[in-house]
Each structure stands twice: as C-alpha cells, then as structure tokens.
Amino acid sequence: MAAPIWMASPPEVHSALLSNGPGPGSLVAAATAWSQLSAEYASTAAELSGLLGAVPGWAWQGPSAEWYVAAHLPYVAWLTQASADAAGAAAQHEAAAAAYTTALAAMPTLAELAANHVIHTVLVATNFFGINTIPITLNEADYVRMWLQAAAVMGLYQAASGAALASAPRTVPAPTVMNPGGGAASTVGAVNPWQWLLALLQQLWNAYTGFYGWMLQLIWQFLQDPIGNSIKIIIAFLTNPIQALITYGPLLFALGYQIFFNLVGWPTWGMILSSPFLLPAGLGLGLAAIAFLPIVLAPAVIPPASTPLAAAAVAAGSVWPAVSMAVTGAGTAGAATPAAGAAPSAGAAPAPAAPATASFAYAVGGSGDWGPSLGPTVGGRGGIKAPAATVPAAAAAAATRGQSRARRRRRSELRDYGDEFLDMDSDSGFGPSTGDHGAQASERGAGTLGFAGTATKERRVRAVGLTALAGDEFGNGPRMPMVPGTWEQGSNEPEAPDGSGRGGGDGLPHDSK
C-alpha cells in the first residue's frame, strides 16, 4: 500500500489494526524455529564432514573411497548453505517482529485518540462567546498530528516488513547422493524380476497393514469410552462443524469403512471367489429347468392349391352342357338330358375361364377331360342351362367370390380332384325308400309367430331351409339342405312337356314348383 492510502484513513483504523492483531509472538516463534533448524543443519554438516575425512583411513581405500567422498561433498555443501539460509530466515523474522514492535510503540493509542475526542466535545460545548477558540484549535492540531503520525508509522512498518520478506533466503532442494561410477556398475548386472516383484508386494503389504493398523487404533481409542466419545463428537459438530470434521473425520471414516466393508465387502468378495465353484452348479440347475419347459411346435401350414379347376374352353355348338347331381341317402341319381337350343357361330371361341372353387361341399367340379363340367348352372329355372364353369363371366365371378370367401375365413385351400366323390352317411344302414314321407319343420327354434294375443293356424306347409329327415333312427338329428322337389326318387323319370327334364335347376336349394 502507498503512503497516500495510509494517509486517507484516520488514525483510529491503524491503531486498531496494530493493537488487535496477533502481535509479534508468532514472528518470534518462527525465528526461534529457523534458528534451531540452522543449528541442526550445521551439526549434520560437521558430522558428515568428519565422517568423510575419516573414510580414507578406514577399511575403504582406493577409488571406491574417493568416489564415496566425492558423492557426499555436494550434500555437505548443501547442508552448510541450508544452515546459513535458516539463520538468515531467523534474522529476517526477528527484524519483522522488531518492526512490528516499533510501529506499535510509535502508533497513537486508542486511549489517546478517545481522550482527544472527549476534550474536543467538552470545549465545543462550553465555547460561550468564543472563549474556547484557542483550546479547540490546539486540540484539533493535536488530532492532526496523531493522524500524520499514524500514517507515517504505517508507512515505515510496511517498508521494514517488506524488506525483511524480500531479503529472506530461499532454500534449494538437496542434491542426490550418487556414486559417479554407480551408474555404469548398475548396468552390468541384470535386474532380477522376482526380487522386484517381492519388493513391490512387500511395499503393498506394509501399506495395507499400516492403513489397517491406523484405523484399528482409532476404533480402539473410540471403544475405550464409546458413550463419552459419542457425546463429544455430537457437541463438537453442533458447536463448530468444520473443526469437528477435521478432528473426528479420520475416526468417522474408519468406522464407516469397517461397517460398509463388513456388510458389503465380505459377501461380495465371497461371491467373487466362490463363483468358479458355483458356475457348474448354476449351469446344471439351468439345464434341468430347461428340460421341464413345454415345447411349442409350430402349426403345420397347408400350401394352397396352386392349380385351381379350370373350365374347358370348347365351342358352344359342338358340346352341350349338362348337370349331374347325386343325392346321398335317397338312393337316386340324376342323368343329363340334352336339350335343343340355338347354337352360336362356330367362328368365335370363348375366352379362357378364370380359376374357380367348388360352391358346394357335396358337389365337385371337374375338368374338361371328363365331359360336361359339374357345378351350379347359370340361367332360369326352366330349360337346359349351361354350367357356370363353361361361361367366362360367370366363372370369373365365381372365382372372385371364392377367393374373397377364402380370404375372410383365412383358411388354406384344399386340392380337389375330378375323380373323387363324397358319400354322406354311407354306413347309416338306410333301407329302400317306401314312400315320400314329406319334410317336416325342425323342432328347433321358436316356431311360427303371429301378432300378439293371436293363435297360429295349424296347417301343413312345406318346409324351407333346414329340415329334419323323417322315419330314421336319428330323429331330427342330422340335417341337410333342401333340394328341388323335381328331383324325385328313382333312376327313370319322363321328360317334362317343356323339355326341361330334371336338369332345369340352377343348383341352388329352393322349393319345387
């Protein structure tokens, strides 16, 4: 700090700083310690110098003794210089302490400054008609003197302490004591790795035992009086937490380390060390558990029919379509009857038909190699109708409906063959039909319903939809779709007057006319 800064502050500030400080005691103690260190360095240097002077007269002689003396001479010189530096540091500490003592003695005291303020207050209060003008002026001049004196004292103290700090010597690091020929000799012999490893393990073991010995000593001291020590720790943390943490931090660390390691460390290391023995047991248990797991097989996927039934493309004038239907359980078979019709021109060939699937479970479509195709017919109820498979538009529509229905059901299509046939209840043991018993309505359902509060009329009506077969051993158990009433029992049936015969149906269940 410069002189104008010291001058800017009142003398009370400087006097309070010097009076309330730690005093010169710490500087004097530091000077004493440096003096003792200087004496120790000097004693060590003198002892080592005497030892080096006696080396040539001992058992060592020749170059080895000379190398030994030459290796220690720099260290002896450093000890001598360190002793001088320590003595200089002690002298500078003493100079700083003397400067502080001088500044404190020359600084106006707080009592003098307080007395000056009290006298000034009294003189101003009793200054009637200016009778205290001269005493007030003298008092203010005395205060100005103390102001200037305090600033000057602080300036001198700053200069003296700064000079002592700047002139204090700096001790350099000690030189390494090494034999000049030792480096070459060390390269001759090879280093034994086992000795180096043993030395490293010994150092690690010493560090480990020292660390545990230190912790156990702290814990043992705490266990001598656990209640009293706990109370002391709590009081220390409540009064001064920082100092308590510095004082009792090592003890708390030792306790926490032991608690954590005993609860977590030992089980963890036990599992790690025993893992090679537990691995085969765990592997065996895992394989045994796998043996009891259920095996889920993937469902078999039935490939869809790659080649659907194709309708035969023939000329309409050369081949006449016919319908053949076999009704199982009734013992009748339908025969195809040709019918006259207008033939289209022979020059035009029909377009190829799209793939189509069978429309009924009891009717199997056939290819063109087996003659007229089987399946539902297209047209009205009367006359000879062409099968749907022989008409391109109808075949395409039937194929589209079949594909849509297959996609909705999400089922795999099954391959059908033209030479296969299906018998329904072929082993039921039905005898020859004795007569037309008629069809009666099924007893399932709510029956015929009318208006509320009215009774139904009992009259015979022809059943439509699902019916039950009469006169068999199953009663109304098995069901089958209705077929046209024109399909009578027996193999021979006269042709209808209009020439329609038995082939005039469209293949769909409906009532007979």
UniProtKB/Swiss-Prot annotation:
Listed GO CC annotations: plasma membrane
Cited SUPFAM superfamilies: PE/PPE dimer-like (SSF140459)
Its membrane topology: Multi-pass membrane protein
Record-linked Pfam families: PPE, PPE-PPW
TM spans (from-to): 233-253, 277-297, 309-329
Span list, region Disordered: 395-446, 469-513
InterPro entries associated with the record: PPE-PPW_C, PPE_dom, PPE_sf
Record keywords: Cell membrane, Membrane, Transmembrane, Transmembrane helix
Function: Important for the siderophore-mediated iron-acquisition function of ESX-3.
Name the record gives this protein: PPE family protein PPE4
Gene that this polypeptide is encoded by: PPE4
